[in-house]
């Protein structure tokens, strides 16, 4: 747990400006990217497809995830000294850690610089994902081990308030990986990945847990688990901006699924469509996984990460021999069916996170892992232009020093 005086000391360094080369054309969005406990801010030049590092802050432990307030005035970050950000690629055992927290920041409307507000909140275990509800009234946090959820009120000034008591025992599945709230603010989705089988035990079954949501209070509603959750390891989901379609990334299966949403927000029990995310599914390697996904703001395309890396006996990351790409799909606007139209090489390894800028003219992929010195592949931010047909054109990459921690999270946030 971090003391308030230490957090205040961290706050003093939030506005520290790092040296930079040339100021790009102004952008109404900023990119934030972590390297361990450091969270760096980059200015975006959309016309030149360029990033300029401007400042950074340091959190008490490795950044796990972050999410903006709907007003875009505030920004929330969760951190932990446990979990996969402290482990080698493919590791079967990861530290649980002792320092887990949630912090609130005010976003400078001109520059995107972050200023801490209020006191950080200690969390019970490693947070793996977080989001803010559509009303901007509550922040929801998902934990993978033990799989669980907490909700905190947000105060009028954007700072974090008290925990919201839940009235009953929540069905939080096995290995929660993402928590999202629908646009109507009435339904919460907890994506629980489960775990793949090992030589000693069968798989832990995956599911998408669905809760009713009333101002931060959750109530069990449904569990979506085709085939009883067997061979079903969902990681992340996203929503179509105008149609009642939910898109789901299956990690171990390297699949994209589409579900219909009823008027009350409940997904169908089985997918409408299931598609392969890899360019050549027959060549799938041992450490090949699907990652996060994002629907284009116009609803015509969806993007999904494919990830591959392994570690040697010393824990150093190596090329997994598989595919590190962003899969691009065109979405049929009448049926919701996705058609794979491109697998764009990310020019790095393990693109754990990626984001589109608000204009959807750029996509930036955060290649998490630096491969061994022999292979000479650095962790990096890879920048792509987005064509009108949804396909990606690689422009350049910016290496990220991960000597003190991996590029575990990055995102692009529109300024207030």
Report residues per predicted region:
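Residue-level detector of Asp-centered blade-edge/turn motifs that repeat once per structural unit
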Residues: 25-27, 70-72, 132-136, 182-185, ...
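Short, solvent-exposed loop/turn segments at conserved positions within beta-propeller repeat blades
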Residues: 33-35, 85-100, 142-147, 197-206, ...
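Short loop/turn segments immediately following beta-strands, especially the blade-tip
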Residues: 42-49, 105-112, 151-160, 210-218, ...
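Short loop/turn segments immediately following the C-termini of beta-strands
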Residues: 34-36, 80-82, 144-146, 154, ...
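Asp-box/WD-like beta-propeller blade repeats and closely related beta-sheet repeat scaffolds
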Residues: 113-183
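Conserved beta-strand position repeated across blades of beta-propeller domains
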Residues: 67, 131, 180, 238, ...
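A short beta-strand motif characteristic of beta-propeller blades
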Residues: 52-58, 115-121, 163-169, 219-227, ...
